[in-house]
């Protein structure tokens, strides 16, 4: 059994620690607030973020980052905007060659870089693996069957992570397409916000199905333009994650979208949700990327207008419905062309 450290004691970090601990691994769950970690150790439960889930004896909550020195694998479970800063803080503790698994689903604001690119810059002596897929912490913590995907340019590292994470209730696939896996996990949060808008406005299943279907089409367009394999967006990190995030009561992005659709201001919504809503930041980045790559992303554009330009969600839905006539098969043809380009030339790994 392996020695594993999870840095970030929120709901997802705790759920992964519990899953790996039940598999027999020795897991250090590292948080920044010493008093909270001491309380978690006493209670054997993370009441603020994952109430009702008992920590197995193999999971040790701690505020001491020094335990990272012993880790064979580090699972980084912090918000996307904290990834670079966190990597800078902890890199002195890591042994050379320690595998680093990123679980955040977002992009770096300003640079537009994927988080594996950020980690490669800050931790150049460590294999970087990304984990994504339809996986709410509340369900993983309760041992409900869950399937995810890990991706890396280092196939041996990806397979090592697969072996360490796999349990009878937590199935892990591998995928060499790091770009597609990261972008699918990040961009689906935008569509989840929009699905929430629709629910908040009182619209029905037809509307949500349209948003999800057309949403995955525009995610795939931009993802392929950025070097991802279009097939990845039809898998766990794309359609799979999109479905669960757009339909689940556990989804922060969907809950935030519902509140916005009901007319609440963004600042109030973010305060009420209480945890990071990745889709808000990602909407701005995706909007800027769509303009950079000259890719049509009408749903993302309307989400941007609602979040950052004060547009009314109902008007945004009307704008989408009143767009010029299109032929759906053109979308399929474009994706097929991009897929052929990917297979012929391989992914643009941007130096990874």
From Swiss-Prot:
Reactions that this protein is recorded to catalyse: sn-glycerol 3-phosphate + NAD(+) = dihydroxyacetone phosphate + NADH + H(+); sn-glycerol 3-phosphate + NADP(+) = dihydroxyacetone phosphate + NADPH + H(+)
Binding residue positions for sn-glycerol 3-phosphate: 105, 133, 135, 188, 241, 251-253
GO biological process: carbohydrate metabolic process; glycerol-3-phosphate biosynthetic process; glycerol-3-phosphate catabolic process; glycerophospholipid metabolic process; phospholipid biosynthetic process
Keyword Disulfide bond: no
Keywords: Cytoplasm, Lipid biosynthesis, Lipid metabolism, NAD, NADP, Nucleotide-binding, Oxidoreductase, Phospholipid biosynthesis, Phospholipid metabolism
Binding-site positions, NADPH: 11-12, 32, 105, 137, 252, 276, 278
Cellular compartment(s): Cytoplasm
Pfam families according to UniProt: NAD_Gly3P_dh_C, NAD_Gly3P_dh_N
Record-linked InterPro entries: 6-PGluconate_DH-like_C_sf (IPR008927), 6PGD_dom2 (IPR013328), G3P_DH_NAD-dep (IPR006168), G3P_DH_NAD-dep_C (IPR006109), G3P_DH_NAD-dep_N (IPR011128), NAD(P)-bd_dom_sf (IPR036291)
Keyword NADP: yes
Highest taxon in the source lineage: Bacteria
Enzyme Commission no: 1.1.1.94
Signal peptide: none
GO MF, any single term: glycerol-3-phosphate dehydrogenase [NAD(P)+] activity
Stated role: Catalyzes the reduction of the glycolytic intermediate dihydroxyacetone phosphate (DHAP) to sn-glycerol 3-phosphate (G3P), the key precursor for phospholipid synthesis.
Similarity-based family: Belongs to the NAD-dependent glycerol-3-phosphate dehydrogenase family.
PANTHER family the record matches: GLYCEROL-3-PHOSPHATE DEHYDROGENASE (PTHR11728), GLYCEROL-3-PHOSPHATE DEHYDROGENASE [NAD(+)] 2, CHLOROPLASTIC (PTHR11728:SF1)
Protein name (Swiss-Prot/TrEMBL): Glycerol-3-phosphate dehydrogenase [NAD(P)+]
Naturally occurring in which organism (per UniProt): Desulfitobacterium hafniense (strain Y51)
Gene behind this protein: gpsA
């Amino acid at each position: 059994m392996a020695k594993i450290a999870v840095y970030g004691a929120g709901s997802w970090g705790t759920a992964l620690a519990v899953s790996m601990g039940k598999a027999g691994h020795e897991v250090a769950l590292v948080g920044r607030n010493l008093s909270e970690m001491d309380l978690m150790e006493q209670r054997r439960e993370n009441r603020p973020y994952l109430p009702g889930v008992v920590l197995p004896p193999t999971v040790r909550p701690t505020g001491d980052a020094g335990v990272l020195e012993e880790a064979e694998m580090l699972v980084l479970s912090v918000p996307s905007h904290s990834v670079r800063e966190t990597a800078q803080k902890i890199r002195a503790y890591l042994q050379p060659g320690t595998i680093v698994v990123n679980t955040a689903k977002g992009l770096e604001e300003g640079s537009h870089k994927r988080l594996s690119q950020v980690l490669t810059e800050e931790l150049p002596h460590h294999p970087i693996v990304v984990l994504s897929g339809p996986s709410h912490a509340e369900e993983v913590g309760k041992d409900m069957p869950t399937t995810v995907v890990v991706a890396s340019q280092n196939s041996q590292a990806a397979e090592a992570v697969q072996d360490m994470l796999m349990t009878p209730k937590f199935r892990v696939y591998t995928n060499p397409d790091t770009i597609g896996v990261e972008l699918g996990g990040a961009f689906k949060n935008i569509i989840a916000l929009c699905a929430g808008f629709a629910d908040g406005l009182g619209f029905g299943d037809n509307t949500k199905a349209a948003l999800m279907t057309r949403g995955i089409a525009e995610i795939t367009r931009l993802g392929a333009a950025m070097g991802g394999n279009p097939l990845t967006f039809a898998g766990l990190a794309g359609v799979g994650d999109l479905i669960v995030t757009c339909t689940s009561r556990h989804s922060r992005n969907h809950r935030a979208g519902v509140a916005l659709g009901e007319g609440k201001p963004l600042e109030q919504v973010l305060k009420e949700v209480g945890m990071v809503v990745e889709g808000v930041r990602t909407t701005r980045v995706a909007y800027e990327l769509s303009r950079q790559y000259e890719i049509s992303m009408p749903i993302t554009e309307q989400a941007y207008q609602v979040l950052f330009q004060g547009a009314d969600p109902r008007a945004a839905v009307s704008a989408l419905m009143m767009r010029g006539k299109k032929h759906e098969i053109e979308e399929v043809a474009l994706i097929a062309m991009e897929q052929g380009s990917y297979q012929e030339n391989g992914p643009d790994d941007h130096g990874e």
